[in-house]
Amino acid sequence: MKIKYQHGKFIFPEQISSSAANISCGQVGDATNQQPPTGSGVSVTCAEIQVSYPDLKNVEFYRHGWNSWSPTSWWSVTKPPYRVWNNPPRSLTAEDAYSDDPKVHQSYLLTAIKVDPEKDLIMLIGSLGGESGYFEIGEHLLTARKLPDKTDNSAHPVPSKCDKDSYVSWWVGTGTELSVFQAYAAALRKSLGSKDKRLNRYPGTIWSSWYSWFEEISEETIEAEIIPAGRSGYQVLEIDDGWEKGIGDWQPNAKFPSGLEALANKIKNNAMTPGIWVSPFIAAGNSTIVQEHPEYFIHDFSGNLEPAGYNWGDYYYGLDCTHPGAKTWLKEILTTIYEWGFRYFKLDFLNAAAIVGRRYRTVSREYAYQEGLKTIREALPDAYLMASGALIGPSLGLVDGMRVGPDTAPYWDNTERKQDPSGPAVRNAALNSLSRYWLKPLVALDPDVAFTRSRGSLLSPEVNELTQNLARVCGNFSCSDPYTWLTDSEKNQVREICTEFGMPPSVKQISRFKFRSGNEVVDFAPWLYPTERISDRILAK
């Protein structure tokens, strides 16, 4: 299907212009100059959409990343592609390594092009039903098609124009930026059907161990936080990475001699929900499960285990969520943790289940990923699932909350990773999270933790406040500041914020980076894209 923007007008196929609800590949009629109403859109089903815009120069487009950490922002076709540059191990984690191309502007799930900046007019194309559409954006041509995949020893053949296996349900809309993103979100929510029932759960305020103790946690460090966290007003206390014997060996290590059930009981006795970090879709090569059951993991097409990412000083492997034995193992480990008393699960590195490779069943990689999430939900029917490293589209309706940006950090930016917009930093986390604000009607947004502390941090008080405002805008407040690290003033601030977040704050988006939160107007643009010197207010690592 072809769409053209020329001489200030969209030229749509006839069926779209007459507001047909659905059209199928091979049924597109002649073009017409009629325009769909501003802020509206229609759904179409076809293998490919091409949008040409021969008159436009220096096109600004919306680049949406595949998973939680993937770079997401408005960008220009005149710049190098917005992606993780020249770091293959990092790309395995923060990009779709299979489709990633250093020479091509790409987007996943949706994209938009700004066709008239003076009138705030954009065109948006997005996939529906929880599937990640794939987009390539050039100076004068945008192409949308199914996500590239490979399920056997040869690449998928190029689909014919009416090969139904290559069909994607798309939404196409035009109008002002905010109105079109809102309309697409509404259409996407409707397309999720019965999965929509999991929306709008609120976890409450969260204390997490990660951004202070990282992997150096122990039974003593967690115990020391329980009573102060409860008194401060936190509603969830989450034990992050560092409790397990190893990645894939999900049992408490020697630093937790009493086990985790005792800690979960202490958390509950202090009126909080016990939370835990686990990465159920990955395992290290030396883990018991990989050693005993390598068949549970995704292989390359030569029969070797396929690396799914790099962390903890080595490569790790992705679970084959179509394998019956892998599903049984997945349910067993999660049921065990649930029986310890945990009801809030931070599920990390989920994208590993969607890498290209050979699986037990020949299905698309996103289908296999969703099979894994459904298995998790079967094991944890009433738990709150916060998905990190998650595929955005395929996770919608299957999880409660989702990380929508890279890791934050106790510093503004990392100058050593300037060419990695997925690298840990407050700026990267804020830019990604705000660029995905349109997802808020679909899933609880996790922008990562806010900061109040001055100890162990390079952040100024102004940037601490910015992280707190980011939490307000996204509707979720989490924090990793240890109680003993805080001044009396900072302790009071935590209590006030926890009280404020008894229910999510009321927020209205005014423009791309400007919001009204309660009675306050917050504009993030001067921080993200400063027009004056701000180095006296920030510190970069």
What are these model-predicted stretches?
Residues 1-187:
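N-terminal accessory beta-strand-rich subdomains and adjacent acidic, glycine-rich linkers
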Residues 161-165, 362-541:
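Active-site-proximal substrate-binding groove within the catalytic cores of carbohydrate-active enzymes
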Residues 184-194, 224-225, 258-260, 292, ...:
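Alpha-helical scaffolding within the catalytic cores
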Residues 187-236, 240-245:
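An acidic-aromatic substrate-binding cleft motif
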Residues 208-220, 314-329, 455-459:
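Active-site mouth loops of central-metabolism enzymes
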Residues 211-213, 280, 478:
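Residue-level signal for short, function-critical loop segments
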Residues 233-449:
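Aromatic- and carboxylate-enriched substrate-binding clefts and catalytic-loop regions
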